[in-house]
């Protein structure tokens, strides 16, 4: 999110607010405001430790969300400073055993739609495959979430399900949030 006024409004609605530091993203930011109520999350794709460390310091990040092929070791180092959210692209063939090597090194998983891009596709995968996830790490649901899915999400059950990641389904255009749509969705 680039519009600081929108960030302040979203902050009142969310527990986490993400800022994308992947330069190839149409949602890329290089400045972030201070947050009082939500945790500030830096979103990265295949970063170096030094790159993330620099952003943690410059932007006072509370958490990082990692969308690439980051190693458990990198996650472990970062977790000494901030919360770590490791993202996995999920499709019908996804092997949830691949998450186990991260269990001790992250705070949350985020299960998103598998695409060649690193999220933000607006496409939904079959969330029923998450019944195959038997791990201990809590997770966020992502992938094509939009207002019309409020009842589906409300009825989604899993013992490790902790929240949802709202992105492209709640934007006028990339990085331009539709605050009214967000408020209405959250109030439901």
Predicted regions mapped to residue ranges:
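Conserved N-terminal beta1-alpha1 strand-loop-helix module at the mouth
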Residues: 1-188
């Amino acid at each position: 999110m680039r519009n600081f006024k929108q960030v302040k409004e979203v902050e009142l609605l969310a527990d986490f607010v993400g800022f994308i530091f992947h330069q190839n993203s149409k949602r890329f930011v290089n400045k972030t405001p201070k947050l009082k109520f939500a945790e500030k999350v830096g979103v990265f794709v295949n970063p170096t430790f030094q790159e993330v460390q620099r952003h943690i310091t410059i932007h006072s990040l509370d958490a990082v969300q990692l969308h690439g092929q980051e190693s458990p070791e990198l996650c472990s180092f970062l977790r000494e400073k901030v919360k770590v959210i490791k993202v996995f692209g999920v499709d019908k063939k996804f092997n949830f055993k691949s998450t186990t090597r991260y269990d001790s090194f992250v705070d949350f998983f985020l299960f998103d739609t598998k695409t060649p891009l690193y999220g933000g596709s607006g496409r939904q995968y079959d969330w029923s495959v998450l019944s195959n996830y038997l791990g201990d790490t809590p997770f966020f649901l992502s992938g094509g979430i939009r207002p019309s899915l409020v009842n589906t999400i409300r009825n989604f059950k899993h013992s490790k399900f902790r929240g949802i990641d709202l992105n492209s389904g709640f934007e006028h255009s990339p990085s331009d949030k539709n605050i009214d749509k967000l408020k209405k969705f959250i109030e439901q």
